[in-house]
Amino acid sequence: MGLTPMMRQYLEVKESCKDCILFFRLGDFYEMFFEDAKVASKELELVLTGRDCGLEERAPMCGIPYHAANTYVGRLVSAGYKIAICEQLEDPSASKGIVKRGIIKIITPGTYTDSSFLEENKNNYIMSFYLDDNMCAMSFADISTGEFNSTHSNFKEAVVLDEISKFAPREIVLEENIKESFIHTIKERFPNISISKIKEENFDYNIDNNLKEQFNNFNENEYETIVKKSANGLLYYIFHTQKNILSNINKIDYYSIVDYLTIDVNSRRNLEITENLREKTKKGSLLWVLDKTNTAMGGRQLRRWIEQPLINKNPIENRLNAVEELLNNISLQEDLKEDLKSIYDIERIVGKVASKSVNAKELISLKCSIGKVPYIKKYLSGFKSDLFLNMEQCIDTLEDIHKLLDKALLDNPSLSVKEGNIIKEGFNEEVDSLREAKSNGKKWIASLEQKEKEETGIKSLKVSYNKVFGYFIEITKANLNLVPEGRYIRKQTLSNAERYITPELKEMEEKILGAEEKLIDIEYKLFTEIRDFIEENIDRMQKTARIISDIDCLCSLATVALENNYIKPNINAKDEILIEEGRHPVVEKVIPKGEFISNDSLIDTKENQLILITGPNMAGKSTYMRQVALITIMAQIGSFVPAKKANISICDKIFTRIGASDDLAAGKSTFMVEMWEVSNILKNATSKSLVLLDEVGRGTSTYDGLSIAWSVIEYICNNKNLRCKTLFATHYHELTKLEDNIEGVKNYSVSVSELENEIVFLRKIIRGGADQSYGIEVAKLAGLPSPVINRAKEILQHIEGDKEENSLNIAPSKEYKSKDYIEVSKDTLNTKNNLGSEIKHDTLSETNTATIIEDESTKEHLSSNKKQINCRTNDEKSIKKEVAVDSFQINFEYIKIDKIIEEIKNIDILNMTPMEGFNKLYDIINKTKDID
């Protein structure tokens, strides 16, 4: 048995969209078959059935009503699927044989425009990426708003990932032969992004003509070839999916990555710029604090401002001056905000105009929105700052469009543009005439019903209408005996009624329905003419929408500044960040009002280049560092800042290495990720950058970590091409000595108060290094069980021991045969336990013994810290090792313990077999047997 004609047609269509779920129109339903049906039934919770199709087995099938498709499409697209819509392209009743069908649209995560599934304050970007040797280009479009941005740079994965993080596209279009390793990197970092591939030729084909046709501002000589290829590839994909050239995408905006403050992927996450670390939601982010916008357009624009802070002084100061003027004119600001509240999403409405999907109600929303523009222009004339004056000169009031919409459309039109009831009375004579005929016909129907009731005496008689039988007279069976013989023609029998018609009724029906049908056709024709006129003026409306969104952003920043007592920062060119009584903008909003402790900051590229911050965990070091970065970002956005005074130097890049970012499932340890991030910072930071480093070196052994942290500080301060402004938090108290040896290092610490064996974090950053880490106290605050805390205190007391002794004699373990004698002079090392707390080792009596791990790394470490080491050979039977320490002594027993602990920490358990794990455990147990 062969395939049925319908199934053959289905399979032919499906062949052209293998990566999509095919919605195949059959009558009033969209049907899905085979694997598509299985996926859709699971995702949409539909019943999976089957259909005979000429194969040995029934084809799996599920379906949805065509009029409810948007809801189901939205759910599938949100889950990352692509949907191909296959429609009937001819009237089934007029078709001979199988109905002609074809794909009219492909809906993908990056091309979806249904406002009910899009976040109104967030763009829905689709991105294209093109790589050519060592250069790459990227383009980003939001087809719902018409934005189209392109850039290019030398190819570095980090640069591409930063741009992806900034724009957060839902979908990325790549050349089909691009390396899978690169795709894997993207998916690993951004698992929710959909990847689509197109052929190399689609980036090249008819490139200049395509771009000229699409963009009003395109000049082929202004763009690098690689940029044009990236843009052309994205346009091809949009046309391929939308089956239409979208007129709202009419301007290409090229930007250089270095035109904005660079905030890399990790820093965006660590600083919680647009979403918090835990829930990945807006609440608790900088955007959450600053967003008091009144329009969807303004909300999207403010997000862009925050994602792309400025690095040029003039535009920053223009924004700051505008915000200041709003704060000095509160009544005018309130008038502006009140009108902004009445403005709908102009950008997305005209986007629907371009895609021919706009309805009359949305055009009424457009009319109401642009009706507010003349008032906004009037308010702008009351300001004096350059930014507002320029806006007042450039804003188009769109009065001609408002006049047309107001004259043409009913205030409350039908939702569907093919049901009539759209055009206002007086706009078109033919519409008025047909409406009168329709109205008169219905009046005649009403009078007929009243006449028949009176003449037959049947009070329940009624004249009704349905699409199957048209108009009819309905009489209940209880009153059939009252029906005059021959008065009516029987049409239909129901269980408790009879339906009749008369020649006169049918004649009037033809007039009424003819008028209705013609009226619907004419109203739809007029609507499309209005829509086409608006489409011709899309660029005018987009320019006005952008000005409105900028005004909304400035009003939002002014509102936040007023509510939170922010001040206007001074933007300087001195490479200096000076903040008096600065506050963390987010933290102060989530704790009781007035409880946040403010702090001062002074960072420059000279005497205060690297601020070395010591102090216990939970004391506020990380909050303080983030606070400085966020205040800098806010200033470069053009926002007032949470401080008493702020003098901000413009930064070109902000880097952070704060908090854990392990990826154990990918086989990456904490330390490896940390080192990768530090490496990225040291390679890419400049003297104009702001760098935040927290606990560098903590993921490895104490000695290794201290050495790395020390070396990183030296590199930052001594490298003439770097010398970036740096905040460096650490538990390695030994590093505080660097203030005396390295120019630009300054010690600061978090103030702590001790009251009755309890500690209180004062959250105040003070000059000088910390002398304790309070590790046990922090553990107690964190809720560790009392027995653990008490035992820790006992161990610490034992380690500290008797500090009056000035030397330590340690006998070597029996397993060592060395005759070396090591004497370490004053100012040797402090060591740290694995919680980061400082360990001050005790002075042991001659009866105390400890195993000395004698390896080259220990010797090298001691040597690198300029300790006096004298080695001399003695008789094997009188081996003696003496370590003389000024204020404390090192118990090498703990060095061995530390090494075992580090070995345990570095076990890659995810990649071990059970037997390997058992053997590793047995090996560790054996190593501990040597320790007393």
From Swiss-Prot:
<dbReference type="InterPro" id="IPR007860">
    <property type="entry name" value="DNA_mmatch_repair_MutS_con_dom"/>
</dbReference>
<comment type="similarity">
    <text>Belongs to the DNA mismatch repair MutS family.</text>
</comment>
<dbReference type="Pfam" id="PF05192">
    <property type="entry name" value="MutS_III"/>
</dbReference>
<dbReference type="GO" id="GO:0140664">
    <property type="term" value="F:ATP-dependent DNA damage sensor activity"/>
</dbReference>
<feature type="binding site">
    <location>
        <begin position="615"/>
        <end position="622"/>
    </location>
    <ligand>
        <name>ATP</name>
    </ligand>
</feature>
<dbReference type="GO" id="GO:0005524">
    <property type="term" value="F:ATP binding"/>
</dbReference>
<dbReference type="InterPro" id="IPR045076">
    <property type="entry name" value="MutS"/>
</dbReference>
<dbReference type="Pfam" id="PF00488">
    <property type="entry name" value="MutS_V"/>
</dbReference>
<dbReference type="Pfam" id="PF05190">
    <property type="entry name" value="MutS_IV"/>
</dbReference>
<dbReference type="GO" id="GO:0003684">
    <property type="term" value="F:damaged DNA binding"/>
</dbReference>
<dbReference type="InterPro" id="IPR036678">
    <property type="entry name" value="MutS_con_dom_sf"/>
</dbReference>
<dbReference type="InterPro" id="IPR007696">
    <property type="entry name" value="DNA_mismatch_repair_MutS_core"/>
</dbReference>
<dbReference type="InterPro" id="IPR005748">
    <property type="entry name" value="DNA_mismatch_repair_MutS"/>
</dbReference>
<dbReference type="InterPro" id="IPR007861">
    <property type="entry name" value="DNA_mismatch_repair_MutS_clamp"/>
</dbReference>
<dbReference type="InterPro" id="IPR007695">
    <property type="entry name" value="DNA_mismatch_repair_MutS-lik_N"/>
</dbReference>
<dbReference type="GO" id="GO:0030983">
    <property type="term" value="F:mismatched DNA binding"/>
</dbReference>
<dbReference type="InterPro" id="IPR016151">
    <property type="entry name" value="DNA_mismatch_repair_MutS_N"/>
</dbReference>
<keyword id="KW-0547">Nucleotide-binding</keyword>
<dbReference type="GO" id="GO:0005829">
    <property type="term" value="C:cytosol"/>
</dbReference>
<dbReference type="Pfam" id="PF05188">
    <property type="entry name" value="MutS_II"/>
</dbReference>
<keyword id="KW-0234">DNA repair</keyword>
<dbReference type="InterPro" id="IPR000432">
    <property type="entry name" value="DNA_mismatch_repair_MutS_C"/>
</dbReference>
<dbReference type="GO" id="GO:0006298">
    <property type="term" value="P:mismatch repair"/>
</dbReference>
<keyword id="KW-0227">DNA damage</keyword>
<dbReference type="Pfam" id="PF01624">
    <property type="entry name" value="MutS_I"/>
</dbReference>
<keyword id="KW-0238">DNA-binding</keyword>
<keyword id="KW-0067">ATP-binding</keyword>
<dbReference type="InterPro" id="IPR036187">
    <property type="entry name" value="DNA_mismatch_repair_MutS_sf"/>
</dbReference>
<protein>
    <recommendedName>
        <fullName>DNA mismatch repair protein MutS</fullName>
    </recommendedName>
</protein>
<comment type="function">
    <text>This protein is involved in the repair of mismatches in DNA. It is possible that it carries out the mismatch recognition step. This protein has a weak ATPase activity.</text>
</comment>
<dbReference type="InterPro" id="IPR017261">
    <property type="entry name" value="DNA_mismatch_repair_MutS/MSH"/>
</dbReference>
<dbReference type="InterPro" id="IPR027417">
    <property type="entry name" value="P-loop_NTPase"/>
</dbReference>
